[in-house]
Amino acid sequence: LYFTWGTNMERYTNFKDFYPYYLSEHSNKTTKLLHFIGTTIAIYLYIRFFMTFDLMYLLYSLLAGYGFAWIGHFFVEKNKPATFKYPFWSFIGDHKMYLEILQGKHKII
């Protein structure tokens, strides 16, 4: 496997500048599809957590969300997830991209 590990050395100081970089790390629609699936499952599990306060649902939501996304990065995009360098903004970016997919701004199939 060939990976591109963080060729972008810029440090982002705001989300507005970060988001185009985030999208560039998600250029393959299969990666976006995997993110969409993982985030959909994670949202369902977040809801289950808040209904039951069972911490296992919170753990499962993180595993689903990051698991699907990281499969896309490591095996489809062949890059390092932005989460490793920008965990908070990547989390926000994933949910923004999710909403944009629902709005039809990104193709996933």
Predicted feature descriptions by range:
Residues 1-8:
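Short, Lys/Arg-enriched N-terminal segments with co-localized hydrophobic residues
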Residues 9-22, 78-109:
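Membrane-proximal soluble regions of multi-pass membrane proteins
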Residues 24-35:
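Short, amphipathic, aromatic/basic-enriched membrane-interface segments that mark the entry/exit
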Residues 32, 57-61:
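Residue-level signature of transmembrane alpha-helical entry/exit and packing/kink sites
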Residues 34-48:
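Core segments of transmembrane alpha-helices
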Residues 46-49, 72, 101:
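Structural signal for membrane-spanning alpha-helices in multi-pass inner-membrane proteins
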Residues 47-58:
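Helix-coil boundary and interhelical linker segments in multi-pass alpha-helical membrane proteins
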Residues 63-79:
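Transmembrane alpha-helical segments that form the membrane-embedded catalytic/substrate-channel core
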